[in-house]
Amino acid sequence: MSMLQVLRPALPILAGAAIMLTISMGLRQSLGIFLQPLTKDIAISVSSFTLAIAVQNLAWGFLQPVAGALTVRWGYRPIMLVGAALYIIGLALMAVAQGFLAIMIGAGVLIGASMACTGPAIAMAVAARSVSTAVRSTVLGIVSAAGSLGALMAAPIGQILSEGHGWRIGIAGFVVMSLIMLPMAWIAGRTDKQPTPTTANEIGDTSAKAAAITAFSNASFVVMTCAYFVCGMQLIFITTHLPSYLAICGMDPMLSAQTLGVIGGFNVLGSLFFGWAGGRWSKQVLLGLIYVSRSIVLAWYFMAPPTTTGTLVFGALMGFLWLGVGPLMQGAIVEMFGLKWQAMIGGLAFMNHQLGSFLGAYGGGLIYDTLGSYTLAWQIGVSIGLTAGIVQIAFALLRPPQQPLLATP
């Protein structure tokens, strides 16, 4: 039986989840293109804008396990619909902002809360529930690949609108694109009518507190969660600060949008590859290899002045290594703990990812405002990335994943 035949009953749900994810991730990853014109127009500092992005990441991270736990009680559809509505409101508030407060609430709090309801953890939990074990890792890679197709479209569209009509019209264009999330969330919500498949290590019926205790009793999960910090730090540093870095270096403003688009395009290939690879080799070793490889690419790029070709090659390499982490993390969590609490446990791991994102966004802006350069910021990112990747690989090779120790409610 072909892959298409296996997936046919789940195709509407998978398409809804994938399109919702590609819009939510794509628009968010492209907000950095508005950094320079927005901050100059409403007279706020670079670090103020990046503080809002940092708060977005914290809100996303700390609300992710809450959203995941609520899907067990209320179902996925209402959570995703609320998230889509919050995204639209957040972007609209940004488009009419006259100062820092509106940017903080719109780009920070509202979009952050929305991402907890529409981002990778929820989208991939929906996908994982809808397919069999045999194709699950590959399907998670496909859905993860969709996460950057939005950036492939959104970044160039936003840049063109911003250059031609101003940054407010650019963000208004994002508002229009975000409306697509509402019907997609509704369609993906059909998964609520499906019974939850069971797995060998399924935690099953228990409380959220007991599920969390079970997760953190697993040493492999703890190491994987700690290493996840570097993923958020590196990726948010790039999406938030690369446009500003290229502008400082006197490069064509369109280059940043083109590079974000290249990242999106090559992420499709990377996510598909790592989704496929995760079904064949150790997911945790592959995670460590991604962190090490990203760090090497970052060091290579920032050690020399940027060129057009070098920047696009950097975008291609980083894109390949971008969201491949998603299917590997979610697949490993399903293997360890099952499907019922996947979204919540994935959210617990994601909190650490978002602490890294806070450091990448706000820390990068603070270092730039203080030193007038991004040199120290990328050096920190490379050092921490190499350390986390090596520890992740060593632990995965020396200690196989533990069976879950079930906690009592």
Spans of model-derived segments:
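Intracellular juxtamembrane helix-capping segments at the cytosolic ends
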Residues: L38, C117-V131, G324-F337
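Hydrophobic core of transmembrane alpha-helices in multi-pass small-molecule transporters
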Residues: A102-T118, G310-G324
